[in-house]
Amino acid sequence: MWSWRRAIGRILVRSSRTCLALGVLLVLAGCAGPVSEDARVRPGSFGPGSQEAAAADVAAYAFADAARTSGQPAAAARAVAAVEYLAARLHDRSRTTAVPAAAVPAGDRDDLLLARGRLRAALGIGATVASQTMLDGLLAAADDLAAGDQAGARAALPPPGFPPDIIERLGALPYIWQVNAAAKTIQDDLTRFGDAGR
């Protein structure tokens, strides 16, 4: 009688250990944040030439002064998309980009991820929204807003991924020093890389 009870006890202990190990792995996976993914844009989305360099120029200019996006949701949408694009493209070195890893120090890439998080928080956008979803929506909205099509812009940024007042939030972005600093640093990194290649 005791032998089968011991066998059942061993099975239960092993099952508990397995569940605990799985639980730890799930917690660690959650702490790591959303899985990074590829981020693609059409040529010329941020300007001519390399889209990484063009995006850095857009972001550095827009976020240096809140007045440059205040009341201008189209400009804000493109600038936020620029930060999103740079964070996704430069942080995951497994993807192919025109920019080698050595051109942008790891610390600068980490600061860019922090800046992306600050922007998402200011806009009421969750960390789980995919980078490609952000890019597609923001760039389409920027084009619609520039053409005066606010209804089209809202349709490009639908809930639940984006808050209902996303257009208003874009037009009232506060100055966020982490975003300004990260954008300027990345611009400097890419400028040095470009100069070195000439």
Where are these predicted regions, by residue range?
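Bacterial N-terminal signal peptides that target proteins for export
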Residues: W2-L20
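Secondary-structure junction/capping motif
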Residues: C19, G49-E52, D165-I166
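Bacterial signal peptide processing site
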Residues: A32-V35
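Post-signal peptide N-terminal segment of mature Sec-exported envelope proteins
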Residues: A39-D65
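Mature extracellular/secreted ectodomains of secretory-pathway proteins
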Residues: A60-R198
